[in-house]
């Protein structure tokens, strides 16, 4: 079973209840929860919640490390098989839609990241600008060039990196995919009916995070000395804005405003993915009937 939804929509609480009452085991599908030492800003389930319903694929990486959709697919397939062998139902819960898509449909055989080539691309961008690199991509791979915006350095860099490593364009390589998920899946999405309600939930949750010590959490991460804002972990919503606040780029109130706005944008992107997602059953956040609906559709 998939339980998808935007941030702050109530996925975790519903998943824990489902796991307790209906013989499920939870696998996290979240690119932020994979990181250790990042508990408050990721809204990671607390010790009491994890005691009620353990989650697979959380706290598996140091914040200095990277983790791809391919890494997730590999690890999730191992966990799914183990859960099924135990006679239980895998319940995959989260909002990282790229992970869900990779698991469901399979992935193209793209080469692993090469830090040396990536740094060469960054150095060239620092000198020539990303606009010039985008022009290079358009010449190498017009299809990818049309799809990737010049102001999207992460995807632009990856497209060039793939070509420099393999000698083939990303468009060529993405025409072949690994096998789709070899299991029947029932898919659910949970969200408030009113976007205003979701925005209120996001603001309330960030306030609670601050009360729980989020700024202190980010300060501890900064104090390690080996982390920086270009790492995937530090690009997680809230962490980047709090880091910038601690470096003196803006004041506390601006940090709160920017972090909340970034979280709203994340939720908007997640909902955009979900509205185009096939074969999904929608649930309303907080509805008392959700557990019954999950169990009925599960069959």
UniProtKB/Swiss-Prot annotation:
Subunit structure: Monomer.
Keywords: ATP-binding, Magnesium, Nucleotide-binding, Transferase, tRNA processing
Site (Interaction with substrate tRNA): 96, 118
Pfam families noted in UniProt: IPPT (PF01715)
Protein's name in the database: tRNA dimethylallyltransferase
Any GO molecular function: tRNA dimethylallyltransferase activity
HAMAP family: IPP_trans
Any one of the GO BP annotations: tRNA modification
PANTHER family referenced in this protein's UniProt entry, alphabetically: TRNA DIMETHYLALLYLTRANSFERASE (PTHR11088:SF60)
Enzyme Commission code(s) on record: 2.5.1.75
Gene name of the record: miaA
Record's function text: Catalyzes the transfer of a dimethylallyl group onto the adenine at position 37 in tRNAs that read codons beginning with uridine, leading to the formation of N6-(dimethylallyl)adenosine (i(6)A).
Catalysed reactions listed for this entry: adenosine(37) in tRNA + dimethylallyl diphosphate = N(6)-dimethylallyladenosine(37) in tRNA + diphosphate
Source taxon at top rank: Bacteria
Family the UniProt entry places it in: Belongs to the IPP transferase family.
Positions of substrate binding: 7-12
Residues that hold ATP according to the record: 5-12
InterPro entries to which the protein is assigned, alphabetical: Dimethylallyltransferase, IPT, P-loop_NTPase
Source organism per UniProt: Shewanella denitrificans (strain OS217 / ATCC BAA-1090 / DSM 15013)
Cofactors, names only: Mg(2+)
Region (Interaction with substrate tRNA): 30-33, 154-158, 235-240
């Amino acid at each position: 079973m998939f339980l998808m939804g935007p941030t702050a929509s109530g996925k975790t609480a519903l998943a824990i209840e489902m796991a307790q009452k209906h013989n499920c085991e939870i696998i996290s599908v979240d690119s932020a929860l994979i990181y250790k030492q990042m508990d408050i800003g990721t809204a990671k389930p607390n010790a009491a919640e994890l005691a009620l319903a353990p989650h697979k694929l959380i706290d598996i990486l140091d914040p200095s490390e990277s983790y791809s959709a391919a890494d997730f697919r590999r690890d999730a397939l191992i966990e799914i098989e183990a859960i099924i062998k135990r006679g239980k139902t895998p319940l995959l819960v989260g909002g990282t839609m790229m992970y869900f898509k990779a698991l469901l449909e399979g992935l193209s055989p793209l080469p692993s990241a090469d830090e040396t080539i990536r740094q060469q691309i960054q150095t060239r961008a620092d000198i020539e600008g990303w606009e010039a690199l985008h022009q290079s991509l358009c010449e190498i791979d017009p299809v990818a060039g049309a799809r990737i915006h010049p102001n999207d350095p992460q995807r632009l860099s990856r497209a060039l990196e793939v070509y420099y490593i393999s000698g083939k364009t990303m468009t060529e390589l993405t025409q072949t995919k690994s096998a789709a998920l070899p299991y029947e899946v029932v898919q659910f999405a949970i969200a408030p009916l009113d976007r205003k309600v979701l925005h209120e939930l996001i603001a309330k949750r960030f306030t609670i995070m601050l009360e729980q010590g989020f700024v202190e959490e980010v300060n501890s991460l900064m104090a390690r000395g080996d982390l920086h804002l270009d790492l995937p972990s530090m690009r997680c919503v809230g962490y980047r804005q709090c880091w910038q606040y601690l470096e003196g780029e803006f004041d506390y109130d601006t940090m709160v405003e920017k972090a909340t706005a970034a979280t709203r944008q994340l939720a908007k992107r997640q909902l955009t993915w979900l509205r185009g997602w096939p074969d999904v059953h929608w649930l309303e956040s907080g509805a008392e009937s959700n557990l019954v609906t999950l169990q009925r559709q599960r069959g």
